[in-house]
UniProtKB/Swiss-Prot annotation:
Family that this chain belongs to: Belongs to the pterin-4-alpha-carbinolamine dehydratase family.
Gene behind this protein: PCBD2
Keyword NADP: no
EC number assigned by the record: 4.2.1.96
Function: Involved in tetrahydrobiopterin biosynthesis. Seems to both prevent the formation of 7-pterins and accelerate the formation of quinonoid-BH2. Regulates the dimerization of homeodomain protein HNF-1-alpha and enhances its transcriptional activity.
InterPro entries, sorted: PCD_sf, Pterin_deHydtase
Organism: Homo sapiens (Human)
Oligomer and partners: Homotetramer. Interacts with DYRK1B.
Lineage of the species this protein comes from: Eukaryota, Metazoa, Chordata, Craniata, Vertebrata
Pfam families: Pterin_4a (PF01329)
Full protein name: Pterin-4-alpha-carbinolamine dehydratase 2
């Protein structure tokens, strides 16, 4: 039964895509969030000024944050997690004690998008408020 329902869902999505219909935010293509070359260059300059770096092995940005203790790091991560969930855009991150390493990219298209830039800006504000 689950296989049938899964197939029906896939068929529904395919038909909607062929008709050009939207299925909502969850099914929205990252194409609508792609950066132009000019937007990307400006975003990278702004993010680098804030301490972010581009990864050489893939189209992503990275930054490590340090806090006074684990509680501050965890509070920061909780705040970012709530925003990421609202955006339906989730960071790759790693936490040890007071350090949080964050990588942002859009996995569905394999590149940096407006969503990554927006989340990075939120992350900066969240870190500054800890």
């Amino acid at each position: 039964m689950a296989a049938v329902l899964g197939a029906l869902g896939a068929t529904r999505r395919l038909l909607a895509a062929l008709r050009g219909q939207s299925l909502g935010l969850a099914a929205m293509s990252s194409g609508t969030h792609r950066l132009t070359a000019e937007e990307r260059n400006q975003a990278i300059l702004d993010l680098k000024a804030a301490g972010w770096s581009e990864l050489s092995e893939r189209d992503a940005i990275y930054k490590e944050f340090s806090f006074h203790n684990f509680n501050q790091a965890f509070g920061f991560m909780s705040r970012v997690a709530l925003q990421a969930e609202k955006m339906n855009h989730h960071p790759e991150w790693f936490n040890v004690y007071n350090k949080v390493q964050i990588t942002l990219t859009s996995h569905d298209c394999g590149e940096l998008t407006k969503k990554d830039v927006k989340l990075a800006k939120f992350i900066e504000k969240a870190a500054a408020s800890v």
